């Protein structure tokens, strides 16, 4: 899969699960963002629970929202 230009990838940990597959994630730099699960993670039924370490993609246009693209094992 090709890397997207302009996205920011950061590590974080899931604080809480919210409705509609949305999560509150605390990034490694201390910021808290709202993040939803990427389509491929939904497709493969990857479950995300609080305290999981994840990788979040942020758009440079809105740094308060992101997309969870990977869950560490």
Curated annotation (Swiss-Prot):
Residues in S1-like domain copies: 1-73
First-listed, main subcellular location of the protein, grouped into a coarse class: cytoplasm
Gene Ontology molecular function, alphabetical: ribosome binding; rRNA binding; translation initiation factor activity
UniProt GO cellular component terms: cytosol
Superkingdom field: Bacteria
HAMAP family (alphabetical): IF_1 (MF_00075)
Role summary: One of the essential components for the initiation of protein synthesis. Stabilizes the binding of IF-2 and IF-3 on the 30S subunit to which N-formylmethionyl-tRNA(fMet) subsequently binds. Helps modulate mRNA selection, yielding the 30S pre-initiation complex (PIC). Upon addition of the 50S ribosomal subunit IF-1, IF-2 and IF-3 are released leaving the mature 70S translation initiation complex.
Protein name: Translation initiation factor IF-1
Organism: Tropheryma whipplei (strain Twist)
Upper lineage: Bacteria, Bacillati, Actinomycetota, Actinomycetes, Micrococcales
């Amino acid at each position: 899969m090709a890397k997207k230009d302009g996205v920011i990838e950061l590590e974080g940990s899931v604080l809480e699960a919210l409705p509609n597959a949305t999560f509150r994630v605390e990034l490694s730099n201390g910021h808290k963002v709202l993040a939803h699960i990427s389509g491929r993670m939904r497709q493969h039924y990857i479950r995300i629970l609080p305290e999981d370490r994840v990788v979040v993609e942020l758009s440079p246009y809105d740094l308060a929202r992101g997309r969870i693209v990977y869950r560490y094992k």
